[in-house]
UniProtKB/Swiss-Prot annotation:
This is Putative pyruvate, phosphate dikinase regulatory protein. The lineage of its organism: Bacteria, Pseudomonadati, Pseudomonadota, Alphaproteobacteria, Rickettsiales. ADP binds at G152, V153, S154, R155, T156, S157, K158, S159. NCBIfam families: PRK05339.1 (NF003742). Its EC number is 2.7.11.32, 2.7.4.27. Pfam families: Kinase-PPPase. It catalyses: N(tele)-phospho-L-histidyl/L-threonyl-[pyruvate, phosphate dikinase] + ADP = N(tele)-phospho-L-histidyl/O-phospho-L-threonyl-[pyruvate, phosphate dikinase] + AMP + H(+); N(tele)-phospho-L-histidyl/O-phospho-L-threonyl-[pyruvate, phosphate dikinase] + phosphate + H(+) = N(tele)-phospho-L-histidyl/L-threonyl-[pyruvate, phosphate dikinase] + diphosphate. It comes from Anaplasma phagocytophilum (strain HZ).
């Protein structure tokens, strides 16, 4: 196999760079033979800032600029500077905005400033704080504030899934199922909440738990990786979810993002929002 092509990818935004980073990373995932050096330039608000970016680029290398810049003058300046230095410059949102505008015959809002602190931003911060405070069954006294409740046995990715959802703006409580201990929630009182169970292949869970014990230098906890106990835990969670008609997601072959996306689909359906079908 030949050497990988090397690309210096410069991601530029007058906002947080979150959008351009997400799109760029999704795009380069399609090129496994490509080695990418990523440079993130966020909160670019002046022509002098653009000048510094352009001057820092090594023109002997393969360079590509991907950007989201709302300000018309600054955007044009970036494009002209890149063109002058023979650097390819790709807008992320311009085509989409143009298509929406043409399709609906409406002009884009000239006063839109997505990088300003918005209600959505503060709601996201609130969701993150709430979710952290309610990790691993903590602070269940105000569970009514949750949008989503996740239950599952130990090491089924409840916490990272919860944090990912919180970053999307959902307040999440995750509750561990402990063998022979009743779940500390009243299922009848949660009828209006989305409660989701996470399950996993038994052998896979034992492997994850064994690796966890090794990393903690605690290999004496035999029950934690006992096939019989793990099987009982999984069976009990499955039974509880079936009894309460809670959706159950098998995370054995799922990434955190895929699990979260499935949960969001369940949330949208429960709240009569468009979200498509969820496949577990």
């Amino acid at each position: 196999m030949g050497e990988k092509a090397i690309l210096d990818l410069h991601l530029v935004s007058d906002s947080t760079c979150e959008t351009v980073v997400s799109v760029a990373r999704a795009a380069v995932e399609h090129f496994k033979s490509l080695e990418v050096n990523e440079f993130v330039w966020s909160l670019v608000g002046s022509k002098s800032h653009v000048d510094r970016i352009i001057s820092s680029i090594d023109r002997k290398r393969n360079n590509l600029i991907m950007y989201t810049v709302l300000d018309d003058d600054l955007r044009e300046y970036l494009k002209k500077k890149a063109e002058a230095y023979n650097i390819r410059c790709i807008p992320i949102l311009s085509h989409i905005i143009r298509e929406i505008s043409c399709y609906l015959s409406v002009a884009k809002d000239p006063n839109a400033h997505p990088h300003r602190l918005s209600d959505e931003y503060f709601n996201r911060i609130e969701a993150i704080n709430y979710t952290i405070a309610h990790d691993d069954g903590q602070s269940l006294w105000d569970i009514d504030g949750a949008d989503i409740i996740i239950v599952g046995v130990s090491r089924t990715s409840k916490s990272p899934t919860s944090i990912y959802l919180a970053y999307r703006g959902y307040k999440v409580v995750n509750i561990p199922f402990v063998h022979s201990i009743t779940l500390p929630i009243d299922s009848a009182a949660l009828a209006d909440k989305l409660v989701v169970g996470l399950t996993i292949d038994i052998d896979r869970l034992i492997q994850i738990r064994r690796n966890r014990l090794i990393s903690m230098k605690n290999q004496s906890n035999c029950n934690y990786i006992s096939y019989e106990q793990v099987e009982q835990e999984i069976s009990e969670v499955n039974r509880i979810c079936m009894k309460n008609q809670w959706p159950l997601i098998d995370v054995t072959q799922k990434s955190i993002e895929e699990t979260a996306a499935t949960i969001i689909q369940f949330f949208n359906r429960k709240n009569n929002k468009i979200g498509g079908d969820a496949f577990c």
